[in-house]
């Protein structure tokens, strides 16, 4: 039985980590694409040579032509300019929008049936642009944001309570930026909601608020520490979880930047919400109830994403006609 083909568009730190994880999880063969000659070829060869040690069979190739994407089952897009210290995700908009137009055209031509995961920032605007540029069905194009943000939230909570991360569930909704919405109401430890844990004396509301703020600034914290780059291990692991749910029809409930067309009162926009990912792509949007401060925070986050999308429309008005 032929292995699935996974195309990684962008061969930087995240791309390389993705390629290794695909092999370790035996998800399929890998094509690494990048415009920098030699980089995808070199990384592909390096990772392929780790396979005898790690014990997996997969074929790795590097390419500088979009033709290499031909018939890919999954495309994961990391191409674009990385975030640097002092640079907001929004500052990246103009440069990376052009990249998404080029990548979208390549996917449309060579991998029109693929499930596409976008990681490029500013995420919510870039996945919107990528879907428009590629013309793929919205349910087959998603953004990796909520899985990562929720993982950070879960890690911080597990560390606070000194429990296994496996026993912590948490959802982060909204845009992938400073206005993201970590939902304490729907976050639990062994099924016990965070508000109840506060009442039980396990922690204080002030401490939970600090963890929420740290989650919102999780990416910036790493950028400031690294000084010359941004996070790549956790983002790659998050995208692989999404790809695996699609390839193996696991139907996991994952928070992703998904296309909304009326859900949550939002239309024609990608925003982070819980979705079910299976072999058909986004198979269901989980429209949870939001009220009070949570609803206000979500609406504020949606407004921030809308601002980015509006900026995209001004920069590349031709995207609207696709």
UniProtKB/Swiss-Prot annotation:
Active site annotated at which positions?
Answer: 176 (proton acceptor)
UniProt keyword annotation of Oxidoreductase present: yes
Ligand binding (NAD(+)): 10-15, 34, 96, 119-121
Matching entries from Gene3D superfamilies are given as: Lactate dehydrogenase/glycoside hydrolase, family 4, C-terminal, NAD(P)-binding Rossmann-like Domain
What's its EC?
1.1.1.37
Question: CDD domains attached here?
Answer: LDH-like_MDH
Q: Where does substrate bind?
A: 83, 89, 121, 152
Q: Name one GO molecular function term.
A: L-lactate dehydrogenase activity
Q: Which reaction does it catalyse?
A: (S)-malate + NAD(+) = oxaloacetate + NADH + H(+)
Which UniProt keywords are given for this protein, alphabetically ordered?
A: NAD, Oxidoreductase, Tricarboxylic acid cycle
Enzyme class name: oxidoreductase
An example GO biological process term is: lactate metabolic process
Task: Please give the function described in this protein's UniProt entry.
Answer: Catalyzes the reversible oxidation of malate to oxaloacetate.
Q: Which family does it belong to?
A: Belongs to the LDH/MDH superfamily. MDH type 3 family.
Protein name, per record: Malate dehydrogenase
Gene assigned in the entry:
mdh
């Amino acid at each position: 039985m032929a292995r699935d083909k996974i195309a990684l568009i962008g061969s930087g730190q995240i791309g390389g980590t993705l390629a290794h994880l695909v092999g370790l999880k035996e998800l399929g063969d890998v094509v690494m694409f990048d415009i920098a000659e030699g980089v995808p070829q070199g990384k592909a060869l390096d990772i392929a040579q780790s396979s005898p040690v790690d014990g997996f069979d997969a074929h790795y190739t590097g390419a500088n032509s979009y033709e290499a994407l031909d018939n890919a089952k999954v495309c994961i897009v990391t191409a674009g300019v990385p975030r640097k210290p002092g640079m907001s995700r929004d500052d990246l908009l103009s440069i990376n929008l052009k990249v998404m137009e080029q990548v979208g055209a390549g996917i449309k031509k060579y991998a029109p049936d693929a499930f596409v995961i976008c990681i490029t920032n500013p995420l919510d605007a870039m996945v919107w642009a990528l879907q428009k540029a590629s013309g793929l069905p919205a349910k087959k194009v998603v953004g990796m944001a909520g899985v990562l943000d929720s993982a950070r939230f879960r890690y911080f909570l597990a560390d606070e309570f000194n429990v296994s991360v496996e026993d912590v569930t948490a959802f982060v909704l909204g845009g992938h930026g400073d206005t993201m919405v970590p939902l304490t109401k729907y976050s639990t430890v062994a099924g016990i909601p965070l508000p109840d844990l506060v009442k039980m004396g396990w922690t204080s509301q002030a401490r939970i608020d600090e963890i929420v703020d740290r989650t919102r600034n999780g990416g910036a914290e790493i950028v400031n520490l690294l000084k010359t780059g941004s996070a790549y291990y956790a983002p790659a692991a998050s995208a692989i979880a999404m790809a695996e749910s699609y390839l193996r029809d696991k139907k996991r409930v994952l928070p992703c930047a998904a296309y909304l067309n009326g859900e949550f009162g939002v239309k024609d926009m990608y925003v982070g919400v819980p979705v079910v990912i299976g072999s058909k792509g986004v198979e269901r949007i989980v429209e949870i109830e939001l009220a009070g401060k949570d609803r206000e925070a979500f609406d504020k986050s949606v407004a921030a994403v809308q601002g980015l999308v509006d900026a995209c429309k001004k920069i590349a008005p031709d995207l609207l006609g696709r």
